[in-house]
Amino acid sequence: MANRGQFGSKFGFIMAAAGSAVGLGNIWRFPYLTGENGGGAFVFIYLCCVLAIGIPLLFNEIALGRLTGKNPIGAFRDTGSNKFWIIGAILSLCVSFFVTSYYGVIAGWTIGYIYTSLMGVELSFAEFTANPSIVIPLFIGFIGLNLLIVTKDIAKGIEKASKILMPVLFVLVLVVIIRGLTLEGASAGLRYFLVPDFSKINAATFLKALSQCFFSMSIGWGIMITYGSYLSKNESIVKSALWIGVLDTTVALMGGLMIFPAVFAFGMEPNQGPTLVFQILPHIFSEMPGGNIVGAFFFLLLCIAALTSTISMIEVPGSWLIDEKKWSRKKAAWAVAIAAIVFGIPSALSKGANDTLTNMSIQFSGMTITSFMDIMDFIWGSFFIVIVSLFVCLYVGWIIGPAKIIAELSEGTPSFSTAKFAGVTAAQVWSFFIRFICPLVIIIVILNQFNVF
């Protein structure tokens, strides 16, 4: 069997797993969803989703990975899964692979914006994304950065890179936050972001917040199962998962603190959607003293956030090739990367470079989703993430039973299954959530996507 490797320390695992969770979802997606859904009201519901749904599912996936020491498909198979339940594991590999194919395109844009910010070049976002001679090389270059890390073993590659990149990411975020808070009028942005208006809360707010929770925390991707398989039995999953949740949520909140003070200081509208980062913020930076440096810092941290996420996405199908096909790590990483580039080129061409790919659309539940990239994002980055999460929930809660996972969670944290509060243990609470609360909420989300509610 090929040597899978293992994380060398608890800190390294936390940084790698938090790096996977912390990505464009926190710094790009979370702020624009907040802007579209009532500011502080959305933040409040999101935090509730993280605590009630995200953390229990994070425990679940990491423990399943460490219990078996395998990739998602191997984890299901080794715990007695039949062919039906393995569908969930296969879908998790597909999610990580196909999201990599278009996520890498967006990450490539950040590299281009680092350069234009430093040079003080005014750039039309539409013209930039429509130029294949720019976006495709940037995309390939970004995937190449991933290969430099993923081809090395776990401790020397992903763990070492994450130990460096995650602290750098936090420092860069703080630099941009401090600069934004010094702008005149920034306080209005703080109020919008942090003060909830509960009249804005409705079913749609809750559902969008829950979907963002899955996207942001790498739940339903197979990533946490894979990373859990590299975690030593001596480490506490409970403490590590709590740290991952805290770090991921902190960066999401810091993303809002970066963006909204600057948006309000320059009189911009906060509900600009996905274009907020690439169209609105460069204009704001250009108006700031020293804005080219601040802008370059901002897009550098976006690039780092994307990198710490994509290395984990490539690792998921890569670990399957290592475990099941006995490939070397280098061969598996190259195969996944090349395939991601091939499948990602249509996404790279679908923002203006090719009319067919740009204008193609699908109808789903009253929504029109336009462009190849947006269709891929909806299918793999929204819909199937939720489906995979449901599969894993039901599989652990009702097929293999929570007992094996509770035993795994109790290693390193014996109090998880022994210490009682108000007459119940944390293990009993977790078991109730994983069997009833989490599946019920996920099913409601899925049914809502089909307009049942």
Task: List each language-model region with its residue ranges.
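Membrane-interface "cap" regions at the ends of multi-pass membrane proteins
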Residues: 1-28, 57-62, 66-79, 83-90, ...
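Membrane-embedded translocation segments of transport machinery
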Residues: 2-3, 7, 11, 159, ...
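Helix-loop-helix connectors at the membrane interface of multi-pass transporters/channels
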Residues: 4, 74, 107-130, 231-234, ...
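Inter-helical loop and helix-membrane interface segments of multi-pass membrane transporters/permeases
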Residues: 4-5, 32-37, 67-91, 104-151, ...
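Transmembrane helix-boundary motif of multi-pass solute transporters/channels
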Residues: 11-49, 228, 238-242, 246-247
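Hydrophobic transmembrane alpha-helices that form the core helical bundles
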Residues: 54-71, 85-125, 306-320, 386, ...
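Hydrophobic alpha-helical segments of multi-pass membrane transport proteins
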Residues: 307-310, 333-347, 351, 365, ...
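A generic transmembrane alpha-helix motif of multi-pass inner-membrane proteins
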Residues: 365-396, 419-453
